[in-house]
């Protein structure tokens, strides 16, 4: 029997015993060695050959990934590892480290219970290390640490043995400081990383060796051996006597939780339904006999089987032919056609999958990434996935040949299903479609895939920055009249306080939670009691509060009011850009008693006009995306690095020096960062290392607003003069 087939059979046996399962993700900053680590772990488990590991990039199965040498999608694989005579099933996801693909990390964190955080011994923790760690802790995913590229400390930085240990200690301290800063409760409850307890390992993924304190005691390889063998270049000795896969996977088995231990804690955070229901009890207990509940974390397309939905099964059992429901879509049954697991790029079919595993199934036509799938007709959905970055750039795409237009629309819908961090706007009338992504690289790869994988020739525009609109002041009792003059709506508009905006972004305030729970969170954040209990709608970071009293017919009209509000928020009055951070209070309503005179054609335009006109009176302004920039350069290039930030309307707010290298930290608007890569290279003679990460939206300076607005309006084919309140409010 082939080794691969044997592995699949062993995996299928172990899947039924959650005690011996570990669902883990590998997370790190770009180029710190995640995929090399994953490949060598797979080689150790016998899934790929050892000669090819590290070069094969098994987890980077996409041609684009191998060509660029980076991971773009999160890849899944199941493997078996033996510890003290007992086999364990390890379901592993390798995630991207590039900031443009952070959405994949967020989704992977929902599927796993533990994470191996990888840090380069020379570079130390970097911005993406911080971001991925924050995502892991937010999802209650427990971390262990692997410090990679230890050989570089010895051979490139020429440190001695003591200095090597000091530097490794500093990396551990820095990661602990991050954990403590993000979640002190978890840090104090045993999540602090401690090399002496075995939650930290050191090594070289490329050369296939690792050490940890427990393994040193067992295997006899000491720090002294590590130092001497690295200096002598004898990596084979280390790989033979202290193999990477054994040290890292032993650490995973001993220190990361199994689904039975993890789910009670995680379900509390990611599902806000009633824990006393049958699905609530089943998920907390990881019960294979309860109702099936699964959260879809990935959608991919298989040329033969169609759409493959991958996700974490929290309770129940999945079998071929089962009927499941996707929450939030029409109540029609989706029948499972195939049930399987992933072994890297290959999907292997199995008879059944039980709770606590990561499943790959076909037949869920209605599912998208983030869907809650269940055998029940009705259940509270899982909390939606919170991405730490937002789309900041857009390209317009058109089909090169008109005959490809229907195919392009279909492909864009597929792409939107596969990658929820993309914003896709399809305009079937003009044939121009917009794709918004996390950055230039993200958009380049998505458009490249449309051409290569989907076979559609497209023409793309230059990237355009995504703006937002918001109000800077307050306006009271703006009146919106319906076209027939029989219905009136009165709103007060003002900025939504920053603390509440942050709670919405963090998923602490949603329309899914119980009203009392939401009210309590809002009260704690300083909102007035009457307002806190009358929240009617949250869209993005905008909130509608109904402060009217005893108005006849309002209940049946509320849905139309919300529809009008959503239309106004989709494109603000200044530049038709999405609105954010707006607090709308409905203060009074006058409705016609005859339902025929207060239908959609009357209510929606009245509300939409009131919000848009009111925003202009309250001082509508533009927000632009800003990125945090970190540039590491030799001391003599410091001036070049700072001027690259300051010359782009940026600010430098920190400088840290280590040895002869200085790291300049600042921020600058995305609009000014086009071509940054080429400019920083030439300014520093190619000696700069840099990275950027999303740092939120900030107000566009007053002196630039008009020019930016006019340019956007011109591009969108709107009238070029600045709009006035009377354009929206009927007098």
From Swiss-Prot:
Listed Gene3D superfamilies: 3.30.230.10, 3.30.70.240, Elongation Factor G (Translational Gtpase), domain 3, P-loop containing nucleotide triphosphate hydrolases, Translation factors
Cellular compartment(s): Cytoplasm
GO CC aspect terms: cytosol; ribonucleoprotein complex
GO molecular function (one): translation elongation factor activity
UniProt keyword Cytoplasm present: yes
Binding site for GTP: 28-35, 94-98, 148-151
Coiled coil: none
Domain tr-type G: 19-260
SMART domains recorded: EFG_C (SM00838), EFG_IV (SM00889)
Pfam families: EFG_C, EFG_III, EFG_IV, GTP_EFTU, GTP_EFTU_D2
Residue list for modification Diphthamide: 597
Protein name (database record): Elongation factor 2
Organism: Methanoregula boonei (strain DSM 21154 / JCM 14090 / 6A8)
